[in-house]
């Protein structure tokens, strides 16, 4: 069945056409079944819409506007390209070549005359082609043939392809080209590499066996390309032979293959910069050489020298080497100039002066601030180095004056040079008013007051003038400020005896003790000889001192107790570490609370200050705090504010170390007085102290009593008045005075008593002396001692029921100290101490009972945690709540204050650790807390062991008593069965197999 489609754009008819020729008339087509024909209407047959008048007007106006705009654009472009320089530039670019430069492609412009010739040829070709297409008769007729086209319609092959047909492109199989490998030996390969390096003047490096390297570079000398070896003298080393001919001969032969000599090279042409150049020896016929190729090193006595030739020591220093000093100079210049340039890049640098002017500016500024004849001359540089500030300023000023004309010329040409030179001239300015400065020195020369020294420093700075540094000007300003403050305060200090005006500086010189200077009392080493005094001093050491047994780091003797506090000795520092870092750590003390100068620091007599019985101050009136005092072995240390004197203790058979017993620290004062006692009176002196003075003073007496005892002793032994005292520190916080012995003091920050002799100390015995310090006791102090005692009492109370009940009733804050350790808290909860304390205090004090309730709840939570860090974190999280509950409860109780201090430290540690963790840092507090917890656990285990030991002892007593009662009442034939029962009972109680019972003679049973 045939079909016809209307509207398709195809005009081809499908079907069968008669074989006969067809005329121009209609063509008959036989349509068979299945044949399809498409009929397309012509333009005349299609409907054409007629536009309205308004649309025509709009179209006409828009077309006119578009045409006008296009003409304007064309005119702009025409005017732009009509310029001759623009057309010439485009013409050279159009006929340029695309070349490769490095890794980039760029257009190389053609010369203008070449471009014009090519353009003229192109226009001529266009004109010829146009003439050919238009058939312009040139008047030449050539006979030929005419080709006619048959216009008759004929049948043709019809394709089924539509207008959307797109042929599939042919896939071309790419054949992989096989890599061609060059077959050549190593020498040929090296020669080819040399030719490549020679073409681009590149650097090449030869590496032989080991670390031997030879660096060479092809350099351009005129039109010739010559290889140059990098020699040792280019790095500043002078060698007798720079190249070994046996090693580098083959390398030189390879380098020669890349050499290109394009012009004649004469002997006089070889100069600086030719160092390492490889030249043929035939170029230098006047100078004989050993090798065919010459490696230029320099000239010696006018003759060229080969780098392979070996020179003598004298010739090595005299040869003129031809290194390229200009390249080295500019290399160093470029390196430091680019490194030291300013960082404020607020503009784009553009060159405005030539290189010659740049060199003049640099040379002018350099000679203005660093005047030398040659920069490389060490003598010129050392002259500037060794010159003082005054000499250097004078030298700079002289140089500027000598070359004033040159410098003035540069000032006028360049404003920057003028600015820099003005700054340099300002440095030579000095203070001309020397007369007034010398008058100030004359007035203040013999004055030692603080203000006089401060004014002297200000005058010295003004006298130096430009020589003074910025630090000296800053210090002078500070000193002037201090003088101004003193003057302002001095106007208001009209009241006599004001604390603000109190000054009690330390003695700058040591006291003189005649007993220590007498030659008859010194041995050949200059040490004090005790004589009979040493034999009688045993009354002190046997009754009031105890022997120091080495071991355990002397921890047993570090803490000294007193009624108000404890004192920590530095005896542990006798163990000297051999590590520098640990040795430096031993010089760090533990500072106590540093108090300012108050009324408690001074002593008065009739309203006036008694300076020897007061605390030492600094120049500005602030308190002078004690430093760390290092320990010594077997010494008596005397001297307070001045330099200390070390006196060997009396010699004994074993040379043991002694430390004063608790409460008898003041014996060190009497031992120091014994140094000044006559040998025939030493026995009476020591017996009087042992039998009369010490029983009268007892332990921890007041300073007033000690001073009175010293007065009594000086009555019987007047020579002891000049005896020097040991160091005495004042602790105003605990109302205590510390007599420091040879074992020093780790605690720092105390006030220092100025009294240096016994006669000065006796002032404290006077009733006319008004001073708080004379009522202070003699003792010492160590930080955290109260906390250690509380922890010790808590651990003992956990395993001692009676002591636990006492703590609950009398001092509940010790039980609250269990917050410092999860181990102590859990053990206290397990023995029922928290529950008993809560029931006891809930009736007496609600807040304390609430704290014990909180402790019980916290102990249950802590016991559920598996890790120590989790337990400590739980306790730290509740520290703030405990502090809030303790607020306002028994504020004056020292135990309560110690507990609050511990909780505050826990809270602060928790806050710091959380802040560090949030910022991404890791602290080491977890490890330290674990180690501390292990110590608490170990101390708790020791208490548990003691409790078990006591239980075993009581159990043994029970077995002994029961056996004795049994054998006294029952028959002895049951002894075997009783032994067996005892063994079973002991196994159940102690969980250990005790073995067969060994009967004792007394009670017929052995002790467990």
From Swiss-Prot:
The record marks 322-323, 779-780 as: Cleavage. Gene3D superfamilies: Helper component proteinase. One of its GO terms (molecular function) is serine-type peptidase activity. One of its GO terms (cellular component) is host cell plasmodesma. Residues 180-322 form the Peptidase S30 domain. Transmembrane segments: none annotated. Keywords: Host cell junction, Host-virus interaction, Hydrolase, Inhibition of host innate immune response by virus, Protease, Serine protease, Suppressor of RNA silencing, Transport, Viral immunoevasion, Viral movement protein. It is an enzyme of class 3 (hydrolase). Its EC number is 3.4.21.-, 3.4.22.45. Residues 657-779 form the Peptidase C6 domain. PROSITE patterns: HC_PRO_CPD, PV_P1_PRO. One of its GO terms (biological process) is symbiont-mediated suppression of host innate immune response. Potyviral RNA is expressed as two polyproteins which undergo post-translational proteolytic processing. Genome polyprotein is processed by NIa-pro, P1 and HC-pro proteinases resulting in the production of at least ten individual proteins. P3N-PIPO is cleaved by P1 and HC-pro proteinases resulting in the production of three individual proteins. The P1 proteinase and the HC-pro cleave only their respective C-termini autocatalytically. Disulfide bonds: none annotated. The N-terminus of helper component proteinase is involved in interaction with stylets. The central part is involved in interaction with virions and the C-terminus is involved in cell-to cell movement of the virus. Belongs to the potyviridae P3N-PIPO polyprotein family. This is P3N-PIPO polyprotein. It comes from Peanut mottle virus (strain M).
């Amino acid at each position: 069945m045939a079909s016809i489609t209307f509207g398709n754009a195809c005009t081809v008819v499908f079907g069968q056409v008669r074989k006969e020729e067809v005329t121009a008339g209609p063509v008959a087509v036989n349509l068979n079944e299945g044949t399809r024909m498409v009929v397309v209407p012509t333009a005349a047959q299609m409907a054409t819409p007629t536009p309205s008048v308004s649309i025509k007007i709009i179209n006409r106006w828009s077309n006119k506007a578009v045409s006008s705009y296009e003409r304007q654009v064309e005119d702009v472009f025409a005017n732009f390209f009509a310029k001759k320089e623009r057309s010439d530039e485009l013409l050279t670019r159009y006929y340029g070549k695309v070349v490769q430069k490095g890794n980039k492609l760029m257009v190389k412009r053609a010369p203008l005359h070449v471009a014009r010739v090519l353009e003229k040829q192109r226009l001529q070709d266009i004109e010829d082609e146009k003439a050919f297409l238009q058939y312009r008769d040139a008047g030449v007729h050539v006979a030929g043939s005419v080709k006619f086209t048959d216009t008759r319609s004929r049948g043709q092959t019809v394709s089924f392809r539509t207008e959307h047909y797109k042929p599939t492109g042919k896939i071309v199989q790419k054949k992989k080209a096989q890599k061609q490998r060059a077959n050549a030996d190593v020498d040929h390969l090296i020669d080819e590499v040399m030719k490549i390096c020679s073409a681009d003047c590149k650097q090449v490096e030869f590496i032989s066996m080991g670390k031997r390297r030879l660096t060479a570079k092809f350099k351009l000398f005129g039109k010739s390309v010559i290889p140059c070896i990098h020699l040792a003298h280019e790095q500043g080393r002078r060698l007798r032979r720079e190249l070994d001919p046996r090693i580098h001969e083959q390398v030189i032969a390879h380098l020669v293959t890349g050499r290109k000599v394009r012009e004649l090279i004469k002997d006089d042409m070889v100069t600086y910069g030719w160092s390492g150049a490889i030249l043929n020896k035939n170029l230098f016929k006047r100078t004989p050489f050993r090798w065919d190729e010459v490696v230029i090193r320099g000239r010696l006595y006018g003759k060229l020298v080969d780098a392979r030739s070996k020179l003598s020591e004298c010739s090595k220093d005299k040869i003129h080497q031809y290194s390229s000093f200009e390249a080295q100079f500019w290399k160093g210049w470029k390196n430091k100039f680019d490194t030291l340039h300013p960082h404020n890049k607020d503009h784009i640098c553009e060159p405005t002066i030539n290189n010659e002017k740049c060199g003049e500016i640099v040379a002018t500024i350099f000679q203005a601030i660093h005047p030398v004849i040659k920069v490389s001359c060490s003598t010129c540089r050392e002259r500037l180095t060794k010159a003082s500030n005054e000499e250097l300023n004078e030298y700079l000023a002289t140089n500027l004056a000598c070359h004033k004309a040159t410098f003035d010329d540069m000032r006028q040409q360049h404003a920057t040079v003028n600015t820099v030179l003005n700054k340099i001239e300002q440095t030579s300015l000095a203070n001309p008013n020397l007369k007034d400065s010398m008058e100030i020195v004359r007035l203040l020369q013999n004055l030692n007051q603080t203000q006089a020294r401060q004014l002297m420093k200000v005058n010295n700075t003004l006298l130096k003038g430009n020589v003074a540094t910025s630090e000296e000007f800053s210090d002078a300003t500070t000193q002037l400020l201090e003088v101004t403050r003193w003057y302002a305060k001095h106007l208001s200090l009209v009241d006599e005896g004001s604390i603000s005006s109190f000054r009690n500086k330390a003695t700058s010189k040591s006291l003189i003790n005649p007993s220590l200077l007498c030659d008859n009392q010194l041995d050949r080493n200059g040490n004090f000889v005790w004589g009979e005094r040493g034999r009688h001093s045993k009354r002190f050491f046997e009754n009031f001192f105890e022997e120091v047994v080495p071991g355990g780091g002397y921890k047993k003797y570090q803490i000294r107790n007193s009624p108000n506090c404890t004192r920590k000795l530095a005896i542990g520092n006798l163990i000297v570490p051999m590590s520098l870092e640990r040795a430096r750590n031993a010089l760090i003390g533990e500072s106590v609370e540093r108090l300012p100068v108050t009324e408690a620091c001074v002593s008065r007599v009739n309203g006036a200050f008694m300076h020897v019985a007061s605390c030492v101050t600094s120049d500005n009136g602030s308190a002078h705090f004690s430093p760390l005092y290092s320990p010594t072995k077997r010494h008596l240390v005397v001297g307070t504010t001045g330099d200390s004197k070390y006196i060997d203790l009396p010699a004994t058979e074993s040379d043991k170390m002694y430390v004063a017993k608790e409460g008898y620290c003041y014996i060190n004062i009497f031992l120091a007085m014994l140094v000044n006692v006559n040998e025939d009176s030493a026995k009476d002196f020591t017996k009087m102290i042992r039998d009369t003075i010490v029983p009268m003073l007892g332990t921890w007496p007041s300073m007033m009593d000690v001073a009175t005892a010293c007065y009594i002793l000086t009555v019987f032994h007047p020579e002891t008045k000049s005896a020097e005292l040991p160091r005495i520190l004042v602790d105003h916080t605990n109302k205590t005075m510390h007599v420091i012995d040879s074992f020093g003091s780790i605690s720092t920050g105390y006030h220092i008593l100025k009294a240096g002799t016994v006669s000065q100390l006796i002032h404290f015995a006077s009733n006319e002396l008004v001073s708080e310090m004379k009522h202070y006791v003699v003792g010492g102090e160590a930080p955290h001692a109260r906390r250690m005692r509380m922890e010790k009492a808590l651990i003992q109370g956990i395993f001692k029921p009676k002591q636990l009940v006492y703590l609950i009733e009398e001092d509940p804050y010790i039980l609250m100290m269990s917050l410092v350790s999860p181990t102590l808290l859990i053990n206290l909860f397990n023995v029922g101490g928290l529950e008993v304390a809560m029931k006891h205090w809930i009736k007496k004090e609600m807040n304390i009972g609430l704290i014990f309730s909180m402790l019980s709840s916290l102990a249950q939570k802590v016991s559920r945690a598996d890790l120590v860090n989790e337990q400590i974190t739980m306790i730290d999280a509740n520290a703030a709540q405990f502090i809030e509950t303790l607020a306002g409860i028994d504020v004056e109780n020292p135990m309560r204050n110690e507990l609050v201090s511990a909780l505050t430290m826990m809270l602060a540690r928790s806050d710091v650790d959380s802040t560090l963790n949030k910022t991404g840092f890791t602290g080491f507090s977890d490890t330290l807390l674990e180690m501390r917890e292990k110590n608490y656990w170990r101390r708790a285990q020791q208490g548990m062991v003691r409790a078990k030991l006591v239980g075993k002892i009581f159990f043994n007593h029970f077995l002994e008593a029961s056996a004795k009662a049994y054998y006294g009442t029952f028959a002895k034939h049951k002894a075997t069965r009783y032994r067996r029962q005892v063994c079973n009972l002991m196994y159940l109680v102690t969980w250990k197999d005790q073995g067969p019972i060994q009967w004792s003679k007394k009670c017929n049973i052995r002790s467990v």
